[in-house]
């Protein structure tokens, strides 16, 4: 237990440390166990807020609204978005940059700027907006890569703030999922972060796995969690 808590803390980050494959699998499996333990605590808190605050204030159950939103995603395309494409895009945005290398920052710039301009990662049709978004995003990422190549001190400065960037990433990742709740009421704005705790927990575990095991492991964990939610 002590070894598990030590591994899943941010006290010691050394993404250059190479773990044997068997050790990686063990830490990955323990991460799933840790996730479910923390999720039980988060769900209990969400239930208490739902019953004793949300309903008392005269609003419908936020927890039920979240479940209804999840049920609307179905079929093979829904599976592709939830289990494959969604986790890949979110990991590229929120986790890749946690190891602040030029290549990673450039890829982050490309994906982030593309989403800002195209407004979604769903590729419904090839049109001028899509092509322009790809061109501008590619140009921006190339400029960022060349800038970091000429000024490596920027990369170093970002690396010194790795823990802070990780925690900010975890919080933003969780808060982003508040948008999945149907019929948002701004009167409940201070309570909605409670319902983002499950995503913050998964985001934290993904972040640690990305930093200590590698990008692929964080992506695999993310996809597995989404798969279980999709099948449920």
Tell where the protein language model's regions lie, with residue ranges.
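Perimembrane loop-to-helix junctions flanking transmembrane segments
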Residues: 53-75
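N-terminal juxtamembrane cytosolic/stromal segments of multi-pass membrane proteins
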Residues: 1-33
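N-proximal short alpha-helices
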Residues: 18, 65-66, 70, 148, ...
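Interfacial helix-start motif at the membrane-water boundary
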Residues: 68-88
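Transmembrane helix-loop-helix hairpins at the membrane interface
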Residues: 82-88, 92-232
């Amino acid at each position: 237990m002590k070894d598990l808590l030590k591994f899943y803390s941010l006290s010691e980050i050394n993404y250059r440390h190479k773990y044997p494959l068997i050790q990686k699998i063990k830490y990955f499996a323990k991460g799933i166990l840790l996730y479910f333990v923390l999720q039980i605590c988060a769900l209990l808190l969400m239930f208490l807020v739902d019953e004793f605050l949300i309903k008392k204030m005269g609003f419908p159950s936020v927890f039920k609204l979240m479940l209804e939103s999840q049920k609307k995603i179905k079929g093979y395309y829904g599976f592709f978005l939830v289990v494959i494409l969604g986790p890949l895009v979110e990991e590229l945005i929120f986790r890749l940059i946690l190891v602040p290398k030029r290549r990673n920052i450039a890829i982050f710039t490309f994906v982030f700027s593309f989403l800002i301009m195209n407004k979604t990662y769903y590729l419904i049709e090839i049109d001028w907006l899509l092509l322009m978004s790809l061109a501008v995003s590619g140009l921006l990422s190339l400029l960022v890569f060349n800038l970091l190549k000429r000024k490596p001190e920027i990369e170093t400065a970002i690396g010194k703030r790795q823990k802070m960037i990780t925690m900010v990433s975890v919080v933003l990742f969780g808060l982003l999922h508040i948008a999945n709740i149907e019929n948002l009421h701004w009167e409940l704005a201070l309570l909605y972060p409670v319902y983002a705790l499950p995503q913050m927990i998964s985001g934290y575990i993904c972040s640690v796995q990305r930093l200590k095991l590698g990008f692929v492991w964080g992506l695999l964990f993310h996809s597995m969690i989404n798969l279980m939610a999709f099948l449920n």
